[in-house]
């Protein structure tokens, strides 16, 4: 660099070395200008113009370190406005250098730096977009190729889809893949257009031309899976895959596979034809055997008959059979013998022999000369030879049609095999038995043989078994027959496996309800052949049949060597079936009258307080029972409890108070801190006394518990409360019956889990209540009910009957009960009707399977408000109504009319519409929710104090229940009733204020600590003078000052340290 542009003075050189920046080091100059320099930068920076247009520094400092590497950015000084020559200093005008204003120069340099950064980021972004665009093109090519392959596969599979179910499923799968590929192609195309808008230009067109050339190429192997189309492979690859050649070209010798001959008697595919063919074949072979034996026994030698030529192998001599072939031949003879023996019993199910389970149907293409999978042993062959010879003796020698005859029962080595029927529970009726006499009369010691009317009579035997013969109908046809004809009594339906039993079954079912009903079976099973097994063994069915004419077997016809053998009784429990004739008609019945006698309202003639109403249930007898057994239990543990009735009422008041004033820990009721301290509780009972009573609370004697009753610890209290709840039942006609959950999270055998309930874990109680929520009767659920009364009606129905009997015993009359589908059945309605009551309830589908109502699927397709109904001869009506879903209701006290209109919102019309509703649905909705209302009232202010023992939750529930019942009576008979919370508060205040015992005055305990947050807040901590000296909270010396806010003694000098954290 020339040195004429540098000032000659040493001072100027030093300043230029400190302040000026060369053009080649523009990055450092920009950083220093942004940071503001060191405060000594002058106003002007001079550059000298060079002929090549590059600006050089006016300063050259020898001590400056050169920059390593090429420059990242060159500043174009021509883009920066220079200072006018007239405004330059006189010393600079004669030097011929460019002079710039410092602010202008800084702005110009920063602007060029920003532009360079923006261009660099733009270039980097274009590179990324270009890479993404290439990836999109690859995806587009792959997706297009897959679509072409899928279209070809669809063209190949479409002609075969109508004939094959498997190919139809594959075709559906391919179409779903095509739809997914089309959606993917749309997304890729949209992304391609977006990237084209960013890139634009010729490069995109070049790529598109390249992609269009690739579309004309032949597609490669399919990658859609083996279910779509096999991959094209060469002959070499096929040999390697099948194991005929190694990958190195070596041929592998293959063993000839001999397919075993499969023999099976297929009863469902032409069994009679099979018997005829086998009989003919057996006749021909046994005829040849007879001729051979006759030739061997002849005295003179005879010419042996010519060997029988095989049709499959003509012009060949008969070869000597091997040992295995002889065994196979004897085995076939055995099959033929069995076929001849059982030809008279065509259609009867027979027991499968052990070796028949391994047999499979003969495959197509199997020759007769191939070996079978089963070969009998030598012992079996020897035993069967005698039987075959005896059968061959009866064969005629001519070529006439062969007549089947019974095999002779004699024989030296005849094996006796007991015949076992398929239906073990089938026994002939007593009317079919004939008279018999003992065997060996006078000789003694003879055996006894049973003799029945059908022995030896083939026609009558078939007539007796005809109800059990399978019918060649489909399962769907059999179910339609049972629904339309009520006279058919079926004991079982036997379903054969479908043809595609191993194929995957679709999840789509014909019904949408849970359970094993006919509406839940798939279509493949509905079209399967099935057998209808009817109750043909019943003696009544024989006598009722007019075409039945029993044969008169007199005692003279029975040989004297026979005696009667009684069949054993059947183990199968016969259910009593009620056959009803249903018709479409409405129920016309008058509602029940309700209670006969009026309730004793003497107590409610005067206004009663909440406590007095509660003590109708928790009277002196109940409280004395609790006090007695609690003291007894404490005494057995060596603790002197000394509980009294007054003290228990105070304890019960604290329990009720915890329902609407809950704290995380029950001990917090007795704390002295002002945020949780409860004056009413702490003044009524000491904390430790409450804990002692709660841990020893009992209502039964542990030494005399019923081992069968799982709730025997609570049974005395439950029984007494049931008596009092039933005594004060309001005068109602309609009562609901439902279940009630008590929360419990411990371990117990009776704990239940009910999904979808507000309380999922806990004990379940069966409750009968009025429509407003007064619980009349309750029992805990403990699995198997120890009370076996009415158990023939089921668990739910027996509980309803027990409740109705208890209600009728306490208040004679006729009532209307409402319950849900767990309890409802036609048998329960009949039983309640016989007791003079009426009932209404939703019913499950399997409880009314014989009622010919319109199906749920058909009703759902119709408009809302459509219903179908039927009535039987006993006054029970069943109605199926379509609302949001299809609901089925059965009733013996409410019919269809009068119809009412209810408001429903229509999603289709986007407005509320009027829907007609049968009267029995209205009755159910109006009177069903009594137990749920009681559950809501109790759960709203449930006691928050819990115990660790399993019986603490149901015990406290009993107290909550009677408190809720007392409030229901208060609402019924009081002219100015209060809500449940106010009623509860009045009971609590009365018990704690009347029966509470305030603690005796004694030594004052340690004062509670002040809140730490208010100690260090620095607000209103004023030091004031106090009357007497106390210990300073900081230095623990005596002082007459204290902090008014913290209420602690403090010196003035200690105040700052105490209030500083």
UniProtKB/Swiss-Prot annotation:
CDD domains for the chain: cc_ERCC-6_N (cd21397)
Stored InterPro entries: PGBD (IPR029526), PiggyBac_TE-derived (IPR052638)
Pfam families in the record: DDE_Tnp_1_7 (PF13843)
Keyword terms of this UniProt record: Disease variant, Isopeptide bond, Nucleus, Phosphoprotein, Premature ovarian failure, Ubl conjugation
Compositionally biased region (Basic and acidic residues): 353-363, 451-462
Tissue specificity annotation: Expressed in heart and oocytes, but not in granulosa cells (at protein level).
GO cellular component, one term: nucleoplasm
Compositional bias annotation for Polar residues: 8-27
GO BP term, example: positive regulation of DNA repair
GO molecular function: sequence-specific DNA binding
Acidic residues: bias regions: 364-392, 506-515
Involvement in disease: Premature ovarian failure 11: An ovarian disorder defined as the cessation of ovarian function under the age of 40 years. It is characterized by oligomenorrhea or amenorrhea, in the presence of elevated levels of serum gonadotropins and low estradiol.
Name listed for the protein in its UniProt record: Chimeric ERCC6-PGBD3 protein
Protein source organism: Homo sapiens (Human)
